[in-house]
């Protein structure tokens, strides 16, 4: 039964997405959104039912191949399903946020000519993400990985007549291909070592190859397992937008706002974090890989958060917040606190989707204005959006009692107790990141909702119910889900059958027993007070003394320029690497393709054959005496050769 239910949960969004894509214009808007919403709702209900089954039987793990995709000799590549605690948790998060986005889209996209196409894309994306998290082997993981990449490309460039959207989706596609190259190499290395792509077989035999090495040069060799982990993490860096492969995510805000909530908050960008947790049996055997993961996550968490302080596009501020929070999740994975990483992934999915959709509500109310400098005073005009945005903001900064408080504090607590190399550096990075998060979050909140309305003549009102209902439904878990779930998800062994966590790194199991003890402990630490201090600083800078931010940007102009130019990563990629490869491509085209292949090989061969033919053709004059002369000359040469050969002069 579990197999059939899992298959239905996976296939339903695919079926409804295809239905909307092929027949959407014929069946109408109401039927299009109805059938796609029903598909995701069915998948969500099944996911919740599977969770109930697992809670009744904590040891329940379903791992079964559906069919053999390819068989070569003794090698078999299969498509299968792995249903365990980690899988079902991700299924619920993906389906719930997807359902909210589907409902939200009814109002947000109701006037868009691509309405049916949009519903098709988001349903197919949901299927791709479910395929990724439900896979039991690297082959299916890769298919799902690439499928979400393709759907992201289509959704970012949904408004394909908009030049900036086309550039953004191309940029996302190219940057992710760099990460995917590392992922492919990592999978290929594992296949060459183990002769299989099945998770269970690889994880069970991983410890036996810890002494195996790969010689990268005559003087340098590396553990094959470490190399595989680093390559896999390279793939995660692209999908989860870790520095320096982070530049695609802010530009992806060119797509419709619902996509920002679905792809760039709750699902696709967390795929890399999910993979790190799923691959914990491999990463736990390589301290080098864990330290590398930790350092990259730490740098991403603090550096991308700083960029959020200087952005003025409402969606880009939240996008840089997403980058920073992804860094937090990666940091937790780097100190082997996979349960804390996954817990923050889940709470973040709710409150970040809420913030993106609330931003969309503001954009709709202001007739598609996105510059926060042109906003203000919307508190009384958009009361529901205001309250839900406040809930999302408090959850994001980790205010006591909200979901983000429990997940972020658990994560930071794990880092503070870690003995992994660079954990002290990571601790200070995430601690400073708490202040930065609070600053950019309430900078955005105060500039949008407080102060004076910039244009008194503009008609501002709350959008329709289809936009407001998802905000309310997302606000509930953003506010309440932390307290009841941190105990089973983090302190207990909920993920015990999904991840490997050595007892030396499991600080939660012996330091805390329930939510109350964790709450009282956190209130005695610095994290909460740093976050609250950030709120007061933001209020002072953007409500009381609004001239100070400009003075600060002038005083610290070099640093401000560095942030405004996003550390010059875009400049480096576009004007150095892109130009270098563009020039290389043009050179290969003009000299290699045109001169060598076309002119010398293809056209040159034809030219030389023609020249030779024309010379030979001159012999065929049609005069008999010419042919007789040639016969005499040929006979003379033949006789000369016979004479010389008989005399021994010719060998």
Region spans (language model):
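Transmembrane helix-loop-helix hairpins at membrane boundaries of multipass inner-membrane proteins
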Residues: 1-5, 23-120, 193-220, 247, ...
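Aromatic-capped, Gly/Pro-kinked transmembrane alpha-helices
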Residues: 74, 487-529, 540-651
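N-terminal signal-anchor/start-transfer transmembrane helix
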Residues: 10-25, 99, 237, 241, ...
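Hydrophobic transmembrane alpha-helices and their helix-loop junctions in integral membrane proteins
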Residues: 100-144, 150-466, 477, 483
């Amino acid at each position: 039964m579990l197999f059939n239910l899992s298959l239905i949960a996976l296939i339903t969004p695919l079926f409804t997405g295809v239905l909307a894509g092929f027949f959407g214009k014929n069946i109408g808007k109401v039927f299009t959104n109805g059938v796609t919403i029903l598909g995701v709702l069915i998948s969500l209900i099944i996911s919740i039912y599977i969770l109930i089954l697992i809670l009744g039987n904590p040891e329940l793990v379903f791992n079964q191949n559906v069919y053999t995709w390819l068989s070569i000799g003794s090698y078999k590549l299969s498509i299968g399903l792995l249903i365990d605690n980690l899988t079902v948790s991700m299924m619920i998060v993906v389906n719930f946020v997807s359902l909210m986005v589907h409902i939200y889209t009814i109002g947000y996209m109701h006037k868009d000519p691509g309405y049916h196409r949009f519903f098709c894309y988001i349903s197919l994306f949901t299927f791709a993400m479910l395929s990724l998290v439900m896979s039991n082997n690297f082959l299916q993981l890769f298919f799902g990985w690439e499928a979400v990449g393709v759907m992201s490309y289509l959704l970012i460039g949904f408004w394909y007549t908009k030049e900036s959207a086309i550039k953004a989706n191309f940029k996302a596609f190219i940057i992710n291909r760099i990460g995917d190259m590392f992922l492919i190499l990592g999978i290929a290395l594992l296949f060459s070592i183990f002769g299989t792509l099945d998770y269970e077989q690889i994880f069970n035999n991983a410890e036996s190859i810890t002494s195996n090495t790969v010689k990268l040069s005559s003087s340098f060799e590396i553990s094959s397992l470490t190399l595989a982990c680093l390559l896999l993490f390279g793939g995660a860096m692209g999908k989860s937008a870790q520095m320096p492969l982070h530049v695609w995510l802010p530009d992806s805000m060119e797509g419709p706002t619902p996509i920002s909530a679905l792809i760039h908050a709750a699902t696709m960008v967390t795929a890399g974090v999910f993979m790190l947790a799923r691959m914990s049996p491999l990463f736990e055997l390589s301290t080098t890989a864990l330290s590398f993961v930790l350092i990259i996550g730490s740098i991403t968490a603090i550096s991308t958060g700083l960029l959020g302080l200087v952005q003025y596009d409402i969606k880009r501020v939240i996008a840089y917040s997403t980058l920073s929070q992804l860094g937090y999740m990666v940091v937790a994975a780097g100190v082997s606190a996979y349960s804390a990483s996954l817990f923050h992934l889940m709470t973040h999915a709710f409150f970040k989707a809420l913030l993106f959709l609330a931003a969309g509500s503001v954009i709709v109310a202001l007739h598609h204005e996105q510059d926060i400098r042109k906003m203000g005073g919307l508190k009384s005009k958009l009361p529901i959006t205001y309250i839900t945005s406040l809930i999302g903001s408090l959850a994001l900064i980790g205010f006591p009692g909200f979901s983000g408080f429990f997940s972020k504090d658990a994560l930071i607590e794990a880092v503070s107790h870690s003995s992994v190399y660079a954990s002290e550096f990571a601790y200070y990075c995430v601690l400073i990141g708490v202040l930065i998060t609070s600053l950019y979050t309430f900078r955005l909140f105060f500039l949008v909702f407080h102060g004076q309305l910039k244009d008194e003549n503009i008609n501002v009102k709350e959008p329709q119910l289809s936009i407001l209902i998802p905000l309310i439904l997302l606000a509930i878990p953003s506010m309440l889900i932390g307290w009841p779930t941190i105990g089973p998800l983090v302190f207990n062994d909920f993920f015990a059958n999904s991840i490997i966590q050595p007892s030396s790194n499991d600080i939660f199991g012996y330091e805390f027993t329930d939510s109350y003890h964790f709450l009282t402990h956190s209130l005695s630490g610095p994290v909460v007070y740093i976050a609250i201090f950030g709120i007061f600083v933001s209020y002072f800078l953007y409500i009381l003394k609004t001239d100070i931010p400009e003075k600060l940007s002038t005083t610290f102009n070099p640093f401000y320029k560095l942030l405004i130019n996003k550390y010059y990563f875009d400049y480096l990629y576009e004007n150095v690497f892109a130009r270098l490869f563009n020039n290389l491509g043009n050179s290969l085209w003009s000299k290699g393709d045109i001169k060598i292949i076309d002119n010398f090989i293809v056209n040159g061969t034809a030219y030389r054959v023609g020249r030779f033919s024309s010379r030979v053709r001159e012999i065929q004059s049609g005069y008999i005496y010419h042919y007789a002369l040639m016969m005499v000359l040929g006979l003379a040469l033949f006789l000369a050769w016979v004479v010389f050969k008989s005399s021994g002069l010719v060998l």
